[in-house]
Amino acid sequence: MKKHSEREMHSFPASGVILKDPVFRHRQELVRKYLAEFDLERVMYSFRKNAGMESDAEPLEGWENPGCELRGHFVGHFLAACAKFAGNSGDRELKQKADAIVEIMEACADENGYLSAFEEEQLDTLEEKEDTGVWAPYYTLHKILNGLVCCGKYCENEKAVRLAENLGLYIYRRFQKLSYWKIDNILRCTRVNPVNEFGGIGDVLYTLWEMTKNEEILELAKLFDRDYLLGNMAEGNDVLSDLHANTHLPMITGALHRYAVTGEETYRKAGVNFYRMIRSRTFANGNSSSRAEHFLRGGVSEQAEHWGANRLDRTCLTGGESESCCAHNTEKILEYLLRYDPEHRLQYLEHLESLKYNAVLNAFSGKTGLSQYHQPMGADSRKKFSSPYGDFWCCTGSGVEAAAELQKNIWFEEKGRIFLNMFVSSELHLEEPKATLCLQSEFPKKPGACLQVETDQAVSLELAFRQSGVKNVQAHGAVCETSCEDGFLVVTGTFGEGSFLELELQAEIREVPLGKEKEIYCLKYGPVLLAEIAGTYVRKEPLCLNSEGDFTGRDCVFRPLYLVEEETYTVYLNSGESTEAKDGSSAYA
């Protein structure tokens, strides 16, 4: 079995990082408040009813309504989010909420291990009809398993681990009764708009095996590593066209997790090759998904959630591009690739920075903390956020869980060297050496930052910054040496209390084309994607950064996309004829 090495580049745990940036922190706090105020009886209504229990609570609506076959998916995300907030920040209120959910789940669990908000008969239907008549039952079971596993990991709740193991073994026994081809049909999600999607169940089962060392759980996890995708990826065959994006992104995460567990090179190659293929399908916000190349007219695949051909063009600006769930899963993939493909780590770090600002942070409302489903970027777009109790889209759930870890992937470590990848005001608490690194930054309002060291005694540190992001470093109160190494600016020195580095950031406005389109392009300021919110931009005209953080021209105003809330906006500009893209509201029908 392969063991994680501290010599591999990895993100510092979220528990060691505290957000200070007002935008990141505010949105995280909004989600935390939403979870804390949510009526637990409403959350667990469908679990109780499915177990034959009475409930006087008002049932949830949207994708969690009692008649929706996906009911229970948000509950899994809710539990995972509560557990992560508790583990990462010591939040006692949300720990109590997570533990209370586990108690209710224990009461709802069947003796055979089955635990869900929907009846077992949905799995019978899936086994009988294979890809019709149900809506993604293993997708929902993944969310429930993940919530329980997170509660075990972050809250040290052994009961949650036992419930997860029992549910995993229940699933294992079901598959043991099926033939090879029956399993292949059930888990082959190659149609557009697939109803047999199974999410990241393989990924979470690898985590469950790491916790329990139950070999049947490991065998089950491997079952979800499907060769129609991973075999082709390992061999370098681009078969992504027409696949449902967020069905298959978690399969790549699972493959890379399998490599982490077993060391099987095939699954590392699958992840690395997948990334080379997804790059040509990735928008300037770092995220993917739009219409399928061969879509069904009138279906979701005509606008959203799929991958098209290995290029982007103006037809991809449907209003349903860039599903938020895809952003969260892409972030997980990039974390693994940083460890297991160090040759391309600069590219992965730059991608992570762009993704975090422009698709992860951008997913959340600055007023409610709730998420967009899709993130439209064409002409005259509008953001549409989930309502607190009426939608419960997949991205509502993945959003609350992602908010609990917004502080991840700012700071990294490799062989004792500390890498700062984003200039988001935050504190990194180090155990060895004992010190706190305090980053103060107002980027993108101001292209500078200050990194201060707090310590009781002088410490030796090796700090690295991407040269593409940092123009100059000046040390104050510390004796340092600066060198350039493989695209990084490396500062090595001894730091005492109050010593600090003054950072001058690389931040110029540049054009980013849409694929090979010559007339369709967007503007980025450093890693930050800009949206036109007023007027008309004339290509190549100079823009000035004002005191409010907006960029103004002769007759136009641009704003960082993640700061747009209710305004009509355009990300991808057209210097030729007008685009056909409109706002994404129809993608939610």
Give, region by region, the residue ranges found by the protein language model.
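Glycine- and aromatic-rich loop/turn segments at beta-sheet edges
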Residues: 43-67, 108-130, 160, 171-194, ...
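Well-ordered alpha-helical segments within folded domains of soluble proteins
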Residues: 24, 68-87, 133-152, 193-209, ...
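A conserved hydrophobic secondary-structure block that centers on an alpha-helix together
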Residues: 122-211
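Catalytic-core region of carbohydrate-active enzymes that cleave or remodel glycosidic bonds
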Residues: 260-281, 316-367
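C-terminal beta-rich recognition modules with glycine/proline-rich loops and embedded aromatic residues
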Residues: 16, 271, 349-358, 363-452, ...
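Surface-exposed beta-strand/loop patches in extracellular or lumenal glycoproteins
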Residues: 459-468
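Structural helix-adjacent loops and short alpha-helical linkers that scaffold large soluble proteins
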Residues: 7, 11-14, 18-21, 86-99, ...
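Low-complexity, Ser/Thr/Pro/Gly-enriched N-terminal "stalk/linker" regions
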Residues: 1-74, 92-123, 158
